């Protein structure tokens, strides 16, 4: 009797449900669910996980929200800072891009451009494109950032899944109609894949149910005792079919069914709640199950909450799509060891159930298998080939395994014992694998070695009739679907579903149990390898692992021998991989002899001892994460979190870490890095390999291991550390060595055929077209690392094409270091951007593999040019940004230092040192001449700020100012020594408090001296004003004509641009980002070289104006060009070479008349920056200008002497003097700026060696000059205000004239109208009025049409100028009035309420109105029905116009009544009655009667052209209308829904409406009914 546990796990779902119920999951109700917050949380969680790795996300980023004291949720500032800085986006985008593109990712704009090149455009919800300013603006604009993250998610999605991949996957296990079911976009492809998998699951369960029923009912079958209910009484699970991706996926059932299909062992079918109608509790349970599985096996790729999945708002659609794409990528690309698609096992179970007697349970190895091991004429080369093929086929995303001579297809066809897959690859490689490689996206296997799954997707071909199969997961397969606990091994063929039942094993007993029978023998080793390798072999690069290792050889000798012989006999059949690579016997026993012959121990093959119980443990502990398994098997002690952390140790000592860490997802349990864009399969960089390259024996000593000979097995690790995207390391050299050589290895002893080599060359280049993202660049940081490891491991070359590409691309590897593809000079960085628009994906031709190599090279060159150009722009932008940041930082520090100076030496106000990072960034962007200078400045500035700013040692000043210090290096060295002596940390201990007090006292003395000098200056004022020889030189003169000095002056006037000194002013932005003049380093360098005298010391200049770097120089008459040197001529003409000249600059606030004349010393810089900040914050600064020749000169002095600050009152100064300015380095300054805005106060520094009166003269001259400029500015401002006021007066006057003219025009129109009405009345009253109307049209033609049209406005009371009338705005509001207020001369009547579109251009401007209205009549006569009154056939009017015919105008009249004359709810009754009458009448032509030119509907008439009779059908009006009664004729335009007057008096079939003379109505006026009772 056979016990079949049909429902052994039947209550597992109940147990899990109860476990979940115990957790008491709280679900946020839908009305409290905030989809926008959920979107922010999901997007931020996703991008942080991708940027840092799921296990390395910083703690503050894991929950992006915080709650404030008012219970309001906000996004954490660190998160906002990261988003605004674009760091996250650059990190994530670098995982998608190719190598040399990654270096350019230095801001939002490069990321936007990179995505747009991939066909993904960042748009907000209102279809407005997201710009860089949207992403960097503060306060943060979250909608723009959400759009950016959505675009990155879409880029990831596109990299992981494509229509071609889905179709190829589905084709493997199902059929579909290409004309009806082919997906048209990614969303449709996802629905298509999920639905096909669910349909396949339905089919599998139904088939299993039928087979079990047959087994039970079969009379020849042994009796079966069921422990539980009969299987037929159980309902099959319901597998849902999706229609809408977001709505139908919310219960999780469809996705769990997909997971079960691929991982039946990990996701039991009985654990899934599959119901036709899913309750909320069932959905919650399924979603929790989905999340649990993702966290355990899929590297925690489920970034949504339970409510997100439950409610699936539309905004989360990209998040759901990227999760589905990741599922697809795991199951179809990476295929870790736990992936066992059900389609590979459905036939196995059927065959074993139907043929129970052909299998012998508990027989580990058959005799035939043993004979095949011993009898095979294998050689060392065979063994190498076998092992190499095994390792090759075990790597999924090793992009170019076979391409570089390393794949399975490399081996010579003369080898008699090729494995099944190897033979298949050989035969199908040129056609099928190439096609699929090109169709696949960047994450598919893009190499010459056709993955079994890829080949199987192409076509199902015949296979051997009988093949041995492993026990695999048979027990769980059956029981997971139907409750059976049968453990099945079987012999299978496509033609027969019958097989014998094997002895069942307990439900949870692992499949390798039978193998342990011969644990000590070599065959025992083989078996243990089998169970251990069962699926790991597919995804790792074990030296001896092979797909065939999966095969469990516990089968009957007949089956084994039959399979062995058939495999040798029928190689043609073996080309196919029929149902998938899972369906083929993964390795025949025949492959083992080579290994036995060499007796290679497993420990050596794997690089270390294997754990015998590993497989069993893995099966029993199905929830183990993949990373953990890898660690167990490798015995590695590495910290797996190293991948995502900056490892300086790796950078410094690359040999310290094992390359194995490259193959393992570091700390994530993630498989993504394992599926990398590697160049070689046997280097293990990207595959799941369980052995270490640092094996006991060198790789070269183990040719059977199938490894490439690598010059340095540690190199992959080196390359990985260089390429780590999160790293700040910019050292390129480490990877240049590796990348220069083509990393192509050659197997020892292998004999490549010429044909194979040619195929490989072809495939190399085709892979370059499609391999841009095969590292799953989107997937994690380690994928890039693995790719680097692949590229760097070997220095051998086997292909000339590779050498050519290496020459072409090796220099590109030096350009950037943060890309996954950088060190793989396989051309992948040059390939064109992958197609990412879905339409392009659908249209992507499979013939791309035949692309000419020249085209590839051309596209590479174009791409390279674009990338370099973009990189250049990015660097320039970054340079400007860094300079402005540095300027602002220094400005802040200057202000802090200045405040410190003026606060009587309070120690707590010491300025904070400059952050080194700003300086270092700037240094990289400068010319070599400037780098020394800037570095010196930064160090000096740090030193000066670290101590009391007033107490600068004389040594520092000497270093700054000594002209003999020509060498910046010497200056830097001296300053470094000084800084070392006065370290900021030792400030408290080194600075003497008494010295501070003395400095403050000295400052007070200086202030008192300044006050005394004020009186002297006022007394000398008259003398200074009258001194002709000391007059200031004219400002507009050239700077070369006068004595120049290197001081730079900055004038910031409040007046409008136009002062004599300023030709062009620069407007300040928002009052906060002050734009100031830039003293460029190039200019300084040039001056330093060209000037015959000592020019502005670069150190001083840069120190003086650090915050003015980012603004272009302004052009003023007195500013020399950048190319011209600035001459320095001291006043005495003495040797200026020996004395330094220090630049000073002035800050002038026009409003307060305060002027600072400052030296370039540190304190002067502080004061200037403080004043500059005050001017900016006051928002009164209008511009900036420079003046190199404003009459100010530097007098060289001994810089070691101290100087004092002198305050000068400017209120009494009136005439400037040509004084000379002396700038010295003061120790202290004090803020004595007066609050009085009227009195000007100037600061300057006096030299104690000079007479105070002489100094006063010089300073007074400059201060007076500034005051005069301020006066001129105020005068100019008053002039401008007067001009503006004059313009306003002119505008008012003009408006008044226009109004008067309009009134006159209105009166004139009224007069004309009255005259016209009078003449019209006279005409009507005449007895023979028939003959006289003929001259009327002529007179009307001579008069401009706009006159008639404009008359209408006198009735309506509206005021319009000479523009054509706008009837819609002059309506009275009556629904029956189509143009109320229009006179009888109105040319076109528009239906009520809609804008007027008249034939004669109603919207014409006033100047054009008369001319166009004059032409309107001509247009009508030339292009309308007036020319075809006699003959309708001659009509040549507008196309939209319904040409009148002799048939009928009933539809036209029907349209007019419905939509124009009687439109609206108010007129519904009269409209219906009128239309009824219209339908009843059988006449061909109808006429509408209007009351007057206002086109108010009155009646409907039928017209008989033969007799010219017009008879009333319904409405108010005469019974019959004769020719004499007709006043105006109208034509209806059905497209415009309006009537237009016809300039004719003769009735014809083209007329749709008319009016009768007014006197006819007037006679009956008392009897007229109201408008709403017209339908009589």
Curated annotation (Swiss-Prot):
Principal localisation: cytoplasm
Compositional bias per record (Basic and acidic residues), positions renumbered to this chain: 428-439, 595-611, 840-852, 1195-1204, 1225-1236, 1274-1323
Localisation per UniProt entry: Cytoplasm, Cytoskeleton
Ranges for domain CKK: 1437-1571
Domain named Calponin-homology (CH): residues: 217-332
Ranges of Basic residues composition bias in the record: 1333-1346
PROSITE patterns listed in its UniProt record: CH (PS50021), CKK (PS51508)
Listed Polar residues bias regions: 613-626, 642-651, 1178-1189, 1354-1366, 1383-1394
GO biological process per UniProt: cytoplasmic microtubule organization; cytoskeleton organization; microtubule cytoskeleton organization; negative regulation of microtubule depolymerization; neuron projection development; regulation of cell morphogenesis; regulation of microtubule polymerization
GO cellular component: cytoplasm; microtubule; microtubule minus-end
Annotated keywords: Coiled coil, Cytoplasm, Cytoskeleton, Microtubule
Sequence segments annotated as region (Disordered): 415-447, 549-572, 595-653, 811-852, 1108-1149, 1178-1236, 1274-1422
Record's compositionally biased regions (Low complexity): 554-566, 813-824, 1116-1131, 1367-1382
Alphabetical list of InterPro entries matching this protein: CAMSAP (IPR032940), CAMSAP-like_CH_dom (IPR022613), CAMSAP_CC1 (IPR031372), CH_dom (IPR001715), CH_dom_sf (IPR036872), CKK_dom_sf (IPR038209), CKK_domain (IPR014797), PRC_barrel-like_sf (IPR011033)
Residue ranges that the Swiss-Prot or TrEMBL entry lists as coiled coil: 857-889, 992-1022, 1254-1315
Superkingdom of source: Eukaryota
GO MF annotation list: calmodulin binding; microtubule binding; microtubule minus-end binding; spectrin binding
Family to which the UniProt record says this protein belongs: Belongs to the CAMSAP1 family.
Function: Key microtubule-organizing protein that specifically binds the minus-end of non-centrosomal microtubules and regulates their dynamics and organization. Specifically recognizes growing microtubule minus-ends and stabilizes microtubules. Acts on free microtubule minus-ends that are not capped by microtubule-nucleating proteins or other factors and protects microtubule minus-ends from depolymerization.
Domain notes: The CKK domain binds microtubules.
Name of the protein: Calmodulin-regulated spectrin-associated protein 1
Organism encoding this protein: Xenopus laevis
Gene: camsap1
């Amino acid at each position: 009797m056979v016990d079949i546990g049909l429902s052994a796990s039947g209550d597992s779902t109940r147990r899990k449900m109860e476990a979940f119920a115990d957790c008491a999951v709280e679900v946020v109700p839908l009305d409290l669910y905030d989809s926008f917050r959920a979107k922010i949380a999901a997007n931020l969680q996703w991008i942080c996980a991708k940027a840092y790795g799921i296990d390395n996300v910083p703690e503050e980023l894991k929950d992006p929200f915080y709650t404030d004291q008012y219970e309001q949720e906000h996004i954490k500032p660190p998160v906002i800072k990261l988003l605004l800085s674009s760091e996250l986006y650059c990190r994530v985008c670098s995982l998608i891009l190719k190598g040399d593109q990654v270096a350019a990712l230095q801001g939002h704009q490069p990321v936007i451009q990179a995505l747009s090149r991939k066909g993904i455009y960042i748009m907000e919800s209102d279809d407005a494109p997201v710009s860089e300013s949207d992403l960097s603006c503060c306060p943060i604009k979250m909608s723009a950032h959400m759009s950016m993250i959505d675009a990155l998610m879409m880029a990831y999605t596109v990299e992981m899944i494509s229509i071609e991949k889905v179709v190829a996957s589905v084709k493997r296990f199902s059929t579909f109609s290409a004309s009806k079911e082919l997906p048209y976009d990614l969303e449709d492809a996802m629905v298509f894949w999920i639905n096909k998998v669910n349909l396949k699951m339905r089919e599998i369960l139904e088939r299993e149910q039928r087979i079990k029923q047959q087994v039970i009912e079969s009379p020849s079958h042994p009796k079966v005792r069921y422990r539980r209910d009969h299987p037929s009484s159980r309902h099959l699970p319901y597998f849902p079919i999706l229609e809408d991706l977001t709505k139908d996926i919310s219960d999780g059932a469809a996705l769990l069914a997909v997971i079960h299909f691929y991982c039946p062992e990990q996701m039991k079918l009985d654990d899934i709640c599959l119901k036709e109608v899913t309750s909320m509790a069932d959905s919650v349970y399924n979603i929790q199950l989905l999340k649990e599985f993702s966290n355990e096996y899929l590297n925690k790729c489920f970034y949504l909450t339970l409510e997100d999945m439950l409610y699936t708002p539309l905004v989360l659609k990209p998040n759901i799509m990227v999760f589905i794409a990741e599922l697809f990528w795991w199951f179809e690309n990476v295929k870790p060891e736990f992936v066992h698609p059900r389609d590979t096992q459905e036939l196995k179970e059927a065959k074993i159930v139907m043929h129970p007697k052909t299998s012998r349970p508990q027989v580990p190895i058959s005799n035939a298998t043993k004979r095949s091991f011993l009898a095979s004429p294998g050689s060392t080369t065979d063994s190498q080939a076998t092992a190499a093929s095994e390792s090759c086929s075990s790597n999924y995303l090793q992009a170019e395994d076979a391409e570089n001579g390393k794949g399975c297809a490399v081996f010579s066809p003369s080898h008699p014992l090729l494995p099944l897959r190897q033979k298949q690859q050989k035969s199908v490689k040129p056609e099928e694998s190439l096609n699929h490689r090109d169709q696949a996206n960047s994450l598919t296997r893009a190499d010459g070695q056709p993955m079994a799954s890829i080949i199987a997707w192409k076509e199902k071909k015949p296979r051997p009739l009988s093949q041995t199969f492993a026990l695999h997961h048979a027990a769980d397969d059956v029981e997971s679907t139907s409750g059976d606990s049968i453990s099945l091994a079987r012999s299978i063929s496509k033609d027969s579903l019958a097989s014998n039942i094997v002895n069942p094993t307990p439900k949870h007993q692992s499949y390798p149990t039978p193998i342990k029978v011969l644990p000590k023998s070599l065959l025992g080793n083989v078996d243990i390898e089998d169970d251990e390798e069962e699926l790991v072999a597919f995804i790792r690069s074990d030296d001896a692992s092979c797909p065939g290792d999966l095969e469990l050889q516990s089968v009957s000798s007949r089956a084994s021998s039959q399979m062995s012989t058939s495999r040798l006999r029928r190689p043609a059949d073996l080309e196919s991989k029929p149902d998938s690579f899972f369906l083929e016997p993964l390795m025949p026993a025949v492959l083992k002899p080579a290994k036995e012959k060499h007796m290679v121990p497993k420990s050596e093959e794997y690089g270390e001892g294997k754990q015998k119980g590993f497989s069993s443990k893995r099966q029993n502990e199905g929830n183990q994460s993949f990373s953990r398994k890898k660690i167990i098997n490798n015995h590695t002690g590495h910290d797996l979190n190293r991948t995502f952390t900056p490892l300086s140790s790796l950078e410094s000592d690359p040999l310290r870490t094992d390359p194995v860490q490259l193959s393992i997802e570091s700390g994530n349990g993630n498989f993504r890095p394992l599926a990398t864009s590697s160049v070689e399969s046997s280097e293990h960089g990207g595959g799941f390999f369980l052995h270490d390259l640092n094996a006991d024996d060198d790789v070269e000593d183990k040719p059977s291991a199938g490894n490439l000979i690598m010059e340095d097995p540690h190199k992959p690790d080196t390359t990985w550390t260089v390429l780590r995207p999160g790293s700040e390391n910019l050292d390129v050299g480490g990877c240049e060595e590796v990348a220069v050589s083509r990393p192509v290895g050659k197997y020892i002893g292998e004999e490549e055929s010429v044909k194979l080599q040619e195929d490989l060359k072809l495939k190399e280049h085709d892979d370059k077209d499609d391999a841009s993202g095969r590292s799953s660049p989107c997937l994690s940081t380690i994928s890039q690392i693995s790719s680097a490891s692949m590229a760097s491991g070997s220095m051998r070359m086997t292909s000339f094409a590779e050498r050519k590409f290496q020459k072409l691309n090796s220099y590109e590897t030096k350009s950037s270091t943060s890309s996954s593809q950088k060190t793989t000079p396989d051309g992948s960085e040059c390939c064109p951007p992958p197609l990412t628009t879905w339409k392009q994906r659908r249209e992507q031709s499979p013939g791309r593999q035949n692309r000419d190599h020249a085209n590839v090279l051309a596209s590479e060159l174009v791409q390279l040019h674009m990338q370099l150009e973009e990189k250049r722009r990015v660097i320039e932008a970054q340079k400007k940004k860094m300079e402005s940041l540095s300027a602002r930082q220094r400005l802040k520090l200057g202000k802090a230092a200045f405040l410190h100076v003026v606060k009587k030496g309070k120690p707590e106000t010491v300025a904070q040192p400059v952050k080194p990072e700003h300086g270092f960034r700037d240094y990289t962007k400068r010319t070599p001449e400037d780098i020394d200078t800037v570095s010196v400045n930064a160090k000096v500035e740090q030193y000066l700020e670290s101590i009391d700013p007033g107490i600068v040692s004389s040594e520092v000043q000497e270093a700054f100012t000594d002209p003999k210090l020509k060498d910046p290096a010497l200056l830097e060295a001296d300053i470094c020594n000084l800084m070392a002596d006065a370290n900021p940390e030792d400030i408290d201990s080194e600075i003497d408090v008494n010295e501070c007090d003395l400095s403050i006292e000295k400052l007070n003395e200086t202030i008192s001296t300044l006050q005394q000098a004020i009186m002297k200056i006022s007394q000398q004022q008259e003398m200074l004003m009258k001194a002709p020889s000391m007059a200031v030189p004219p400002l507009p003169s050239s700077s070369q004509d006068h004595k120049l000095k290197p001081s730079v002056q900055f004038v910031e006037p409040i007046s409008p641009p136009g002062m004599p000194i300023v030709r062009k002013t620069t407007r300040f932005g928002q009052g906060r980002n002050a734009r100031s003049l830039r003293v460029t380093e190039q200019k300084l360098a040039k001056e330093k070289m060209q000037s015959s005298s000592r020019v502005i010391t670069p150190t001083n200049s840069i120190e003086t104006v650090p915050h003015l770097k980012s603004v272009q120089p302004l052009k003023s008459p007195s500013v020399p060009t950048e190319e011209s040197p600035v001459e320095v001529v001291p006043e005495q003409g003495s040797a200026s070479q020996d004395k330094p000249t220090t630049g000073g600059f002035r800050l002038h606030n026009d409003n307060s008349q305060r002027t600072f004349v400052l030296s370039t010393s540190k304190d002067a810089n502080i004061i200037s920056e403080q004043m500059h900040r005050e001017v900016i914050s006051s928002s009164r600064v209008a511009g900036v200008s420079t003046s190199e020749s404003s009459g100010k000169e530097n007098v060289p002095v001994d810089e070691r002497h101290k100087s004092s600050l002198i305050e000068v009152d400017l209120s009494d100064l009136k005439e400037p003097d040509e004084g000379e300015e002396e700038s010295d380095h003061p120790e202290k300054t004090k803020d004595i700026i007066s609050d009085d805005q009227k009195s000007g106060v100037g600061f300057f520094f006096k030299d104690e060696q000079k007479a105070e009166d002489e100094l006063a003269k010089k300073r007074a001259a400059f201060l007076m000059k500034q005051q005069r400029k301020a006066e001129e500015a105020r005068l100019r401002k008053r002039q401008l205000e007067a001009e503006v006021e004059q313009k306003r007066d002119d505008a008012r006057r003009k408006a008044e004239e226009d109004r008067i003219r309009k009134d006159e025009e209105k009166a004139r129109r009224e007069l004309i109208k009255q005259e016209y009405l009078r003449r019209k009345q006279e005409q009507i009253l005449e007895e023979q009025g028939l003959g006289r109307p003929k001259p009327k049209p002529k007179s009307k033609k001579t008069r401009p049409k706009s006159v008639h049209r404009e008359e209408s406005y006198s009735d309506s009371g509206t005021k319009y100028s000479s523009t054509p009338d706008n009837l819609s705005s002059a309506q009275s509001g009556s629904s029956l009035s189509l143009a109320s207020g229009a006179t009888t001369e109105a040319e076109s009547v528009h239906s009520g309420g809609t804008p007027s579109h008249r034939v004669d251009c109603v919207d014409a401007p006033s100047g054009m109105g008369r001319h166009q209205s004059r032409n309107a009549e001509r247009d009508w006569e030339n292009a309308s029905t007036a020319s075809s009154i006699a003959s309708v056939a001659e009509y040549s009017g507008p196309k939209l116009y319904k040409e009148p015919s002799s048939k009928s105008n009933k539809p036209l009249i029907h349209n007019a009544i419905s939509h124009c004359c009687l439109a609206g709810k108010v007129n519904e009754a009269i409209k219906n009655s009128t239309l009824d009458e219209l339908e009843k009448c059988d006449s061909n032509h109808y006429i509408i009667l209007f009351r007057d030119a206002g086109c108010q509907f009155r009646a409907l008439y039928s017209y008989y052209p033969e007799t010219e009779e017009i008879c009333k059908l319904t409405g108010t009006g005469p019974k019959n209308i004769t020719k004499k009664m007709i006043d105006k004729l109208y034509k209806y335009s059905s497209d415009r829904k309006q009537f237009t007057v016809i300039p004719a008096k003769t009735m014809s079939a083209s007329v749709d409406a008319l009016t009768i003379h007014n006197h006819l109505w007037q006679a009956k006026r008392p009897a007229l009914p109201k408008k709403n009772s017209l339908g009589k």
